[in-house]
Amino acid sequence: MILEHVLVLSAFLFSIGIYGLVTSRNLVRALMCLELILNAVNLNFVTFSDFFDSRQLKGNIFSIFVIAIAAAEAAIGPAIVSSIYRNRKSIRINQSNLLNK
């Protein structure tokens, strides 16, 4: 695969994730956009690792760490969202002011 094509794909995924994270008002959608950003970062890690030095696996190892962090976020995030919904009866970001109670 050509490096430029993968970088364009990764930049496109990252841009969609940032746009969704900034404009979404729903916490579940924001978590999904955060996962999209992490996947774009993983794609960059693996691509640069393969392109510059395919014998060393530093990019792949970083990618595994990011996947582990994303898995923890995917497990804890919905639990936090469901807890917020139970307490506030809404998962909209602009309606849930967590500091007022």
UniProtKB/Swiss-Prot annotation:
Reactions catalysed, as given in the entry: a plastoquinone + NADH + (n+1) H(+)(in) = a plastoquinol + NAD(+) + n H(+)(out); a plastoquinone + NADPH + (n+1) H(+)(in) = a plastoquinol + NADP(+) + n H(+)(out)
Q: Main location per UniProt?
A: plastid
Described function: NDH shuttles electrons from NAD(P)H:plastoquinone, via FMN and iron-sulfur (Fe-S) centers, to quinones in the photosynthetic chain and possibly in a chloroplast respiratory chain. The immediate electron acceptor for the enzyme in this species is believed to be plastoquinone. Couples the redox reaction to proton translocation, and thus conserves the redox energy in a proton gradient.
Taxonomy, top ranks, is: Eukaryota, Viridiplantae, Streptophyta, Embryophyta, Tracheophyta
EC number(s): the record gives: 7.1.1.-
Name the keywords, alphabetized.
Chloroplast, Membrane, NAD, NADP, Plastid, Plastoquinone, Quinone, Thylakoid, Translocase, Transmembrane, Transmembrane helix, Transport
Keyword NAD listed: yes
Organism (species): Spinacia oleracea
Tell me which family the UniProt entry assigns to this protein.
Belongs to the complex I subunit 4L family.
State the protein's name.
NAD(P)H-quinone oxidoreductase subunit 4L, chloroplastic
How does the protein's chain sit in the membrane according to the entry?
Multi-pass membrane protein
Which biological processes are named by the entry's GO terms? ATP synthesis coupled electron transport; photosynthesis, light reaction
A Gene Ontology cellular-component term: NADH dehydrogenase complex
Note the Pfam families from the entry: Oxidored_q2
| Molecular function GO labels | oxidoreductase activity, acting on NAD(P)H, quinone or similar compound as acceptor; quinone binding
Q: Which residues cross the membrane?
A: 2-22, 32-52, 61-81
Tagged with keyword NADP: yes
Compartment annotation? Plastid, Chloroplast thylakoid membrane
> Whom does it interact with, and what assembly results?
NDH is composed of at least 16 different subunits, 5 of which are encoded in the nucleus.
Domain of life where this protein originates: Eukaryota
